[in-house]
Amino acid sequence: MRIGLIEFLLILAIASLTVGPRVALFVDRWMRRANRANAMAARRRAEYAAQMAAERDAMLKRFRTASTVFGVGILLVLVYALGFRPIDTPPQIYKAPDLRQETGALQTAVSTDRKTRLELGEYQGVDCIREQDGFVYAAAYNGATLKKRKSDLVRTDGGHAAAILSVEGELTGFAFDAAGDVWLTQLTTAGGTLCRAKHDSWGAAVEQVVTQLDGAPLGAVSAVEVSPAGKVYFAVAAAAGAENGLESALRTELLAHTGTGWVYVYDPADRSVQRVVGGVAGASGLALSPDGRTLYVSDLGNRCVWSMDADARELTAGGKNCQSAFSGLPGYPGALALDEDGILYVSYRWARSSWLEKNADSTLLRGIALRAGRNLQEKLFSLCLLYT
C-alpha cells in the first residue's frame, strides 16, 4: 500500500505530538545535568584556584618570615663576630704619637735600574738582607702561608746565587758573629726560635738555641743582632699569636697596641737569657752601634726608635734610661741598620694610618678591625719608604 504525502505528514504530526514532549523533556534534563556539571566543575576550579592562592600566600608568608629570621640571625652573628667575639689580643686605649718632627732625616731614593738589582731566582720574596765579606746574604722564601713556607739563606755576589741553608717557616732575621756563625730568628706555626748555624763549603748545620722563655714558647721573633762581644740580641714583636706569620702579628699589634713586645739578650758564654727592654708596641727591628754600646729598637705602634745602653736590663720603653732617638716618624718603622759612620737607616713596613691613630681611644672600632680579618686589615695600611 502506498502512502501519500498527506498520510506521511499526518504520521509525522502524530509522532511529534506523541514523542516530541518526551524528547524535549530528555533534552531539557540533559542540558540541566550538563549545566550542573559545568557549574560544579567551575566551582571545583575556583576552589582549587583559591586553595592554590591560599597555599601560595602561606608559602610566601613563611618564606618572608624565614627570610626575616635568617636575616636577623645573620645580623646578630655578624654583630657578635665583629663586636663581641672574644679575641686573643683585645685592643687597648693609647695616645696616638705626634706627627713627624724635623729630625734631619732624609728620604732615600732606591733605584729600580736592573743593573742595581740582585736577582734571586724563583723566590717569592725577601725578609732580611745583610752584607758580609763582600757577599750579600738574603733570607728568601717560597710559600704563601706560614704552614707551607720554606725559607733559605741565599748568598750572592751579584751574579750567581746559592742557598747555604734552609729552614721551615719564616726566617725573620739573621746576623753574623765574629766567628762567622749565623744567628737566625725562625718563626713557625709552633712559635719562634733563636738558632745558630755553622756553615762551610760542605754545608750548614742549624742548632736551636732558645725555643721558650719561662716555660712558654717564644712568640713572633722579628729581628736579631750580635754585639762585638758576642752577645745575641733578639726581639719578640708582641704577645700576639705567631701562627700566621710575623706580618700578621705586627698588624695585630698595630691594631691592638698591647705594648707586649720585648727585646732579649742571649749570652753564649753562660747560655743565659735576660730581658733588655719591654713595653714595646711591636718590636720590629734592632741595630747596634759599631762599638756595641748602644742598642736601637724599632717601636712599630709608637712610630719611634728607642735607644738605650746595650748593657742595660729590665728597661721599659719610654721609661728611665730608654730614650727616643727618633719620634713622630712618617710610618711604622721596621728593620734598622747602622753604617760605619753611625748613620741609622730606618725602613718602614707601612705608612702611617690616619684612621688607626684617629681611633686610638676607640677600642670598639679597632676591635672590629681585629675581628674582620686579614683582607680588611691590609687595606688600612700601605707600603712606605726608607729614611736615614
Language-model-detected regions and their locations in the chain:
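Asp-box/WD-like beta-propeller blade repeats and closely related beta-sheet repeat scaffolds
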Residues: 187-227, 235-242, 246-251
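Conserved small/polar residues in nucleotide/adenosyl-binding loops
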Residues: 387-388
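A short helix->beta-strand "capping" segment at the edge of beta-propeller domains
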Residues: 97-124
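Short loop/turn segments that connect beta-strands within beta-propeller blades
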Residues: 156-160, 198-203, 266-271, 309-313
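Beta-strand-rich domains and repeat architectures in extracellular enzymes and scaffolds
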Residues: 114-146
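Blade-loop segments of beta-propeller domains
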Residues: 142, 148-189, 210-213
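Beta-rich, blade/repeat-based domains predominating
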Residues: 2, 121-133, 167-186, 214-232, ...
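Residue position within the beta-strands of beta-propeller blades
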Residues: 138-139, 183-185, 234-235, 297, ...
